[in-house]
Structures are given as C-alpha cells and as structure tokens.
Amino acid sequence: LHDSTNISRIQHYTMNLYKELEAETGQGCGIFQPGSLYLAQTEKRSNQLQLQAAKAKLYGMNFSEINREHAEELHPLVDFTGIHTIMWEPEGGNVDPSGVTAAYAAGARQRGAEIYRFTKVTATIQQSNGSWLIETPKGNINSQWVVNASGLWAREVAKLAKLDLPLLPTEHQYFVTETIPEIAAQGRRLPSVADRDGEYYLRQEGNGLLVGAYERDVRFWAEDETPAEFGHELFKDDLERIEENVLRAIDRVPVLSEAGIKRVINGPMIWSPDSNVLFGPVPELKNYFCCNGIIPGFSQSGGMGLLAAEWIIEGEPKYDMFAWDLTRFGHWANKQFTKSRVGDQYANRFSIHFPYQERAAGRPVRLRPVYQTQIKMGAVMGLNYGWEHPLWFSDKPNTVETNGFTRQNWFKPVA
C-alpha cells in the first residue's frame, strides 16, 4: 500500500497485471506473494498504518491489523518486542525483474510492437505535423508520439528535445545472505518485513534474506549526466554506510547476525525532487510524454503504463494524477534545488509523511517582496511552484509547524 490512494490502486492493478501477463505470454514473472508485515514502533507510525488500513477497506484491498501471536506464526524468526502495531497484507510480495521485463516484451511483440535493443537515440526532431523523427545509428523512425521512459538516461533523452528534467541519481545498496538454516527449515516462503521506524526492509531470497536500507548518508552519482556507455554495472560495496540500519535489522531478526553475506548490490536509482514520478505530456511540446523517476518501479509499472496509454489515446487518465504531473516543476527547479530535495527524499524515504507536511530542503527558491513582512506577521510558509507563500498565520513570528495525524498547531488559527 501507499500513502496515496491512487498510487495504491496503481500498485494493486500492477500486481494483478503480472498474473495476466504470465497467462497470456507463457513467460514467468517470478511472482512470490508470501504476504508482507508492516511494523510500527511509535504511535504516529501506528496512526499512519491505521489510516492505510482504512483506505484499503474502502477500496477492497486486504490490509488489516493482526496481533503478535498471529504475526509470530506468520514469521517465527522476527522478534516483535516493542512493536505497537502489526499490519498484514496477505497479497504482498515481489517479482523477478528480468522475468517481468521479458513478459512485457513478449506481450508487446504479440500485439505488433517492434523492439530495437542496443539502439542509441541520437536526435528527436519534431515535424511540422506534430509527429516526431527519431534518429538512430541503425536508421530513422517516424512516430506520432515520443514517450520518454528512459530510466537513468531520462535527462539525456529529454535534452534531445530541448527539455530539462529535474532528476538526479543516487547510489542504493542492499545485500543477500548465504543460506540461513532456520529459513530453510521453514519449508515455506516467509513474509517480507517493512520496519520503517528501523529504516530497513527485508524479505526472503532463496533460503537467505535480502536486506536493504535508505541510509542518511546519501551518495549522489552522475550529477551532470548519466554516461552513455554505462551498462548497469555495480558500484563498489560500501556497507559501512548502512551499518546502523543493519544492526537494527539484526535486533529484529536475530538469525541475521550469524548469516554470511553472499553478494552486495550497490547500484543507481534516479529521483525527482519529491520522489514521485515525472508523468504526463510536456506542455511546450506536442505529442511528447514523460514517465521518469519511478522509484518503486516494478510495483507501479503496469499501472503507470495503463494511465500513460489512457492519457495519450483518450486525452486524460482515469485517476487524478495532479501530484505526479511533471508540470508541478518548472525552470525554477534548478540543479541546486533538485540535489537538496533528492538528498532529503532519499534520507527520509522511510520517515512518516504526514498530511500537509512541508519539507524545508532546498528552500527558499523564489521570494516575493512581501516575504519578510509576512514572516514578521507570523506567517508559516509553504512551497507553491517554487514560491514561498503563507499557509497560515501564528500569533508570534518564527512558529514551527507541527505534524501528525491529529489536530496540529495550525488548527485553531485556521479554524
């Protein structure tokens, strides 16, 4: 599930699509659905999970609170001491990325799509009738639309159309352990565990565990441009950066302390300033569509593809995509702002995102002449298309807005 209702719908659709893909193409997607456990160590995290459970019930999704005894039956290797709330998602799981990619390709070819691998795009030129000429070393392609879904190379492809996208890659690492006897002895696949207060995630991989974290020490990569020759090689291992996260994971799953590390994966992922996808048609260009910066890619890819098709063919998607529309950022979202916000988003990936919360990173960007006057009057500022603007006025200057799922310090002044 996701804090956003529409993203939850997209993810739900995507997981169901993978089953349809397998049946239709005969290509396995490597679907594992042993369920997922979500843990809350604090009252506010409990509130967040309870809010998600209420949304799940409204939209017919299976996500509910369970007691400790039930959780221990589901995952006997987890120590649930100190956990306030445990949520259970029976359909939670993961897929095999290579299998899903192959299934998408097979399904597309069955419907007449042509796929050109290892073919660099050297130019995208808009024609007088609104169509596009795409130049490659292997020949030119004429297309009514261009869809930029270029992953790590989204910025470079966008620049071919004189478009700047506020995106920046970071390093991200996780590791897979050797076989853990206690897991092998279970005779079944164990649920994944999301302990966001502990700032790590883990799931079964073979008869071991896959453990990952979003550390506070963010490491940026390819800040100016992604090298054309980059072939998804891995970076040097640097597990010391996630040592604290791993120690918390060991406290929660003690068998992890005796496990050897089988392999470490340290690779890039590309982020937008608010970690949401840059999605939708580009206003300045006719028939040019972007779908870039999808951090949880394989849990959202199918839904994003559906909405992109709807938007292109029918003129609008079925869901409100305002929060993901790429036009939420303009030229004011420069490199400095993007780097500051991406660093903040990465480091706080597992922090609670409260309703109406405003992030301070990268601000201020644009100030109106009345800014200082408003501050002296007690204005609590928010960000709106790069501009600092008053959200509400306190009875004293420099008031810091509180965040939570109950009434906060803005309630009385606004009411």
PLM feature spans:
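Flavin-dependent oxidoreductases
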Residues: 1, 5, 123-235, 244-252, ...
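A short, glycine/Asx- and small/polar-enriched loop/turn
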Residues: 44, 75-83, 125-133, 271-275, ...
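C-terminal catalytic lobe of FAD-dependent flavoproteins
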Residues: 197, 206, 228-366
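Helical element adjacent to the flavin cofactor pocket in flavoenzyme catalytic cores
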Residues: 87-145, 149, 153-156, 302
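Short Gly/Ser/Thr- and Asp/Glu-enriched loop/turn motifs at secondary-structure junctions
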Residues: 32-36, 170-171, 264
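Helix-loop-beta segment of a Rossmann-like dinucleotide-binding subdomain
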Residues: 28-38, 52, 72-111, 133, ...
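Dinucleotide-binding Rossmann-like beta1-alpha1 core, especially the glycine-rich loop
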Residues: 1-74, 197-202, 206-210, 343-357, ...
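Basic, glycine/lysine-rich polyanion-binding surfaces/domains
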Residues: 126-128, 322-415
